[in-house]
Protein backbone atom coordinates (compact mmCIF):
# COMPACT_ATOMS: atom_id res chain seq x y z
CA UNK A 1 0.00 0.00 0.00
CA UNK A 2 2.79 2.44 0.86
CA UNK A 3 4.65 1.43 -2.31
CA UNK A 4 1.86 2.80 -4.53
CA UNK A 5 2.04 6.29 -3.04
CA UNK A 6 5.52 7.79 -3.59
CA UNK A 7 5.16 10.70 -1.12
CA UNK A 8 3.95 8.57 1.81
CA UNK A 9 6.73 7.48 4.16
CA UNK A 10 7.01 3.73 4.89
CA UNK A 11 6.19 2.92 8.51
CA UNK A 12 9.30 1.89 10.46
CA UNK A 13 9.63 -0.45 13.40
CA UNK A 14 9.83 1.34 16.72
CA UNK A 15 11.75 0.11 19.72
CA UNK A 16 10.18 2.47 22.25
CA UNK A 17 6.81 0.72 22.53
CA UNK A 18 4.61 3.82 22.77
CA UNK A 19 2.77 4.12 19.41
CA UNK A 20 -0.05 1.68 20.31
CA UNK A 21 -0.71 3.56 23.53
CA UNK A 22 -0.84 6.81 21.54
CA UNK A 23 -3.40 5.31 19.13
CA UNK A 24 -5.67 4.62 22.09
CA UNK A 25 -4.77 7.94 23.72
CA UNK A 26 -3.33 6.29 26.83
CA UNK A 27 -0.07 6.53 28.73
CA UNK A 28 2.39 3.63 28.75
CA UNK A 29 1.59 1.25 31.59
CA UNK A 30 -2.18 1.80 31.55
CA UNK A 31 -4.30 -0.87 33.23
CA UNK A 32 -6.39 -3.41 31.32
CA UNK A 33 -9.59 -1.68 32.46
CA UNK A 34 -8.42 1.66 31.05
CA UNK A 35 -7.49 -0.02 27.77
CA UNK A 36 -10.91 -1.69 27.49
CA UNK A 37 -12.85 1.52 28.26
CA UNK A 38 -10.84 3.59 25.80
CA UNK A 39 -11.10 0.88 23.14
CA UNK A 40 -14.91 0.77 23.41
CA UNK A 41 -15.19 4.55 23.08
CA UNK A 42 -12.83 4.78 20.11
CA UNK A 43 -14.30 1.70 18.39
CA UNK A 44 -17.78 3.22 18.54
CA UNK A 45 -16.49 6.58 17.38
CA UNK A 46 -14.48 5.26 14.39
CA UNK A 47 -16.58 2.25 13.38
CA UNK A 48 -16.98 2.15 9.56
CA UNK A 49 -20.76 1.64 9.86
CA UNK A 50 -21.10 4.86 11.89
CA UNK A 51 -18.89 6.80 9.44
CA UNK A 52 -19.86 5.58 5.93
CA UNK A 53 -18.68 8.78 4.20
CA UNK A 54 -15.24 8.87 5.94
CA UNK A 55 -12.74 6.64 4.03
CA UNK A 56 -10.13 6.95 6.81
CA UNK A 57 -12.51 5.57 9.46
CA UNK A 58 -11.99 1.95 8.41
CA UNK A 59 -8.20 2.31 8.57
CA UNK A 60 -8.39 4.03 11.96
CA UNK A 61 -10.72 1.28 13.21
CA UNK A 62 -8.20 -1.39 12.12
CA UNK A 63 -5.41 0.42 13.99
CA UNK A 64 -7.55 0.66 17.13
CA UNK A 65 -8.43 -3.05 16.93
CA UNK A 66 -4.78 -3.98 16.44
CA UNK A 67 -3.69 -1.83 19.40
CA UNK A 68 -6.40 -3.35 21.60
CA UNK A 69 -5.52 -6.92 20.57
CA UNK A 70 -1.83 -6.47 21.38
CA UNK A 71 -2.26 -4.49 24.60
CA UNK A 72 -4.81 -6.90 26.11
CA UNK A 73 -2.62 -9.97 25.48
CA UNK A 74 -0.15 -9.88 28.39
CA UNK A 75 2.61 -11.76 26.56
CA UNK A 76 2.48 -9.48 23.51
CA UNK A 77 2.11 -6.42 25.72
CA UNK A 78 5.27 -7.31 27.69
CA UNK A 79 7.18 -7.80 24.44
CA UNK A 80 5.83 -4.51 23.08
CA UNK A 81 6.64 -2.59 26.26
CA UNK A 82 10.20 -3.94 26.28
CA UNK A 83 11.11 -3.99 22.56
CA UNK A 84 8.42 -2.02 20.71
CA UNK A 85 6.92 -3.02 17.37
CA UNK A 86 10.26 -4.55 16.35
CA UNK A 87 9.81 -7.02 19.22
CA UNK A 88 6.34 -7.92 17.94
CA UNK A 89 7.75 -8.49 14.46
CA UNK A 90 10.48 -10.77 15.88
CA UNK A 91 7.87 -12.65 17.94
CA UNK A 92 5.81 -13.16 14.79
CA UNK A 93 8.82 -14.47 12.86
CA UNK A 94 10.59 -16.59 15.50
CA UNK A 95 8.02 -17.16 18.24
CA UNK A 96 7.33 -15.28 21.44
CA UNK A 97 9.67 -17.46 23.50
CA UNK A 98 12.66 -16.59 21.28
CA UNK A 99 12.39 -12.79 21.40
CA UNK A 100 14.82 -12.36 24.32
CA UNK A 101 17.33 -14.71 22.67
CA UNK A 102 17.11 -12.80 19.39
CA UNK A 103 17.78 -9.43 21.01
CA UNK A 104 20.55 -10.88 23.18
CA UNK A 105 22.33 -12.38 20.15
CA UNK A 106 21.88 -9.19 18.14
CA UNK A 107 23.41 -7.02 20.88
CA UNK A 108 26.79 -5.36 20.30
CA UNK A 109 28.64 -7.49 22.86
CA UNK A 110 27.38 -10.80 21.38
CA UNK A 111 28.45 -9.73 17.89
CA UNK A 112 31.84 -8.61 19.25
CA UNK A 113 32.33 -11.92 21.07
CA UNK A 114 31.46 -13.83 17.90
CA UNK A 115 34.03 -11.84 15.89
CA UNK A 116 36.77 -12.21 18.53
CA UNK A 117 36.30 -15.98 18.78
CA UNK A 118 36.30 -16.17 14.98
CA UNK A 119 39.60 -14.28 14.80
CA UNK A 120 41.24 -16.31 17.57
CA UNK A 121 40.32 -19.61 15.96
CA UNK A 122 41.22 -18.60 12.41
CA UNK A 123 37.66 -18.17 11.15
CA UNK A 124 36.59 -21.11 13.33
CA UNK A 125 39.07 -23.36 11.49
CA UNK A 126 40.55 -24.77 14.73
CA UNK A 127 37.09 -25.60 16.05
CA UNK A 128 36.37 -27.52 12.86
CA UNK A 129 39.68 -29.38 13.12
CA UNK A 130 39.04 -30.31 16.75
CA UNK A 131 35.62 -31.73 15.99
CA UNK A 132 36.26 -33.27 12.58
CA UNK A 133 39.95 -34.20 12.48
CA UNK A 134 40.55 -35.62 15.98
CA UNK A 135 42.14 -32.57 17.61
CA UNK A 136 44.67 -30.89 15.32
CA UNK A 137 45.29 -33.80 12.97
CA UNK A 138 45.75 -36.26 15.85
CA UNK A 139 48.52 -34.40 17.72
CA UNK A 140 46.30 -33.55 20.68
CA UNK A 141 44.16 -36.67 20.77
CA UNK A 142 43.91 -38.54 24.07
CA UNK A 143 46.55 -41.19 24.74
CA UNK A 144 45.55 -44.81 24.37
CA UNK A 145 45.40 -46.89 27.56
CA UNK A 146 46.99 -49.90 25.83
CA UNK A 147 50.74 -49.96 25.20
CA UNK A 148 51.64 -49.79 21.55
CA UNK A 149 50.08 -47.90 18.71
CA UNK A 150 47.19 -50.15 17.79
CA UNK A 151 45.85 -53.11 19.70
CA UNK A 152 44.63 -55.80 17.34
CA UNK A 153 43.89 -59.45 18.09
CA UNK A 154 43.46 -61.80 15.19
CA UNK A 155 40.57 -64.28 15.36
CA UNK A 156 43.01 -67.24 15.40
CA UNK A 157 44.86 -65.81 18.40
CA UNK A 158 41.58 -65.19 20.18
CA UNK A 159 40.44 -68.80 19.65
CA UNK A 160 43.76 -70.10 20.93
CA UNK A 161 43.51 -67.89 24.03
CA UNK A 162 40.00 -69.19 24.75
CA UNK A 163 41.15 -72.82 24.41
CA UNK A 164 44.07 -72.33 26.80
CA UNK A 165 41.82 -70.59 29.33
CA UNK A 166 39.37 -73.50 29.18
CA UNK A 167 42.19 -76.03 29.66
CA UNK A 168 43.45 -74.15 32.70
CA UNK A 169 39.94 -74.06 34.18
CA UNK A 170 39.74 -77.86 33.81
CA UNK A 171 42.60 -78.21 36.30
CA UNK A 172 40.54 -76.65 39.09
CA UNK A 173 37.35 -78.64 39.71
CA UNK A 174 34.32 -77.04 41.34
CA UNK A 175 34.32 -78.14 44.98
CA UNK A 176 31.50 -76.02 46.42
CA UNK A 177 28.03 -77.27 45.55
CA UNK A 178 24.86 -75.21 45.99
CA UNK A 179 22.85 -75.98 49.11
CA UNK A 180 19.28 -77.17 49.01
CA UNK A 181 16.87 -74.33 49.53
CA UNK A 182 13.26 -74.23 50.64
CA UNK A 183 10.81 -71.50 51.61
CA UNK A 184 12.30 -71.22 55.11
CA UNK A 185 15.85 -70.78 53.88
CA UNK A 186 17.09 -67.25 54.34
CA UNK A 187 18.72 -65.54 51.43
CA UNK A 188 21.27 -63.87 53.67
CA UNK A 189 22.81 -66.21 56.21
CA UNK A 190 23.11 -65.32 59.87
CA UNK A 191 26.40 -64.23 61.30
CA UNK A 192 29.04 -61.82 60.14
CA UNK A 193 28.91 -60.88 56.50
CA UNK A 194 31.98 -61.12 54.39
CA UNK A 195 32.25 -59.28 51.13
CA UNK A 196 35.54 -60.66 49.96
CA UNK A 197 35.59 -63.22 47.18
CA UNK A 198 38.44 -65.33 48.57
CA UNK A 199 37.33 -68.54 50.35
Swiss-Prot record:
Gene this chain is encoded by: DNAJC5B
Oligomeric form and interacting partners: Interacts with the chaperone complex consisting of HSC70 and SGTA.
Keywords: Chaperone, Lipoprotein, Membrane, Palmitate, Phosphoprotein
PTM notes: Palmitoylated.
Pfam families per the UniProt record, alphabetical: DnaJ
Subcellular location: Membrane
GO CC field: cytoplasm; membrane
Residues found modified as Phosphoserine: 14, 16
PROSITE patterns registered for this protein in UniProt: DNAJ_2
UniProt name for this protein: DnaJ homolog subfamily C member 5B
Domain J per the UniProt entry, residue ranges: 19-84
Primary location class: membrane
Membrane topology: Lipid-anchor
Organism field: Sus scrofa (Pig)
InterPro entries given in the database record: DnaJ_C_subfamily_member5, DnaJ_domain, J_dom_sf
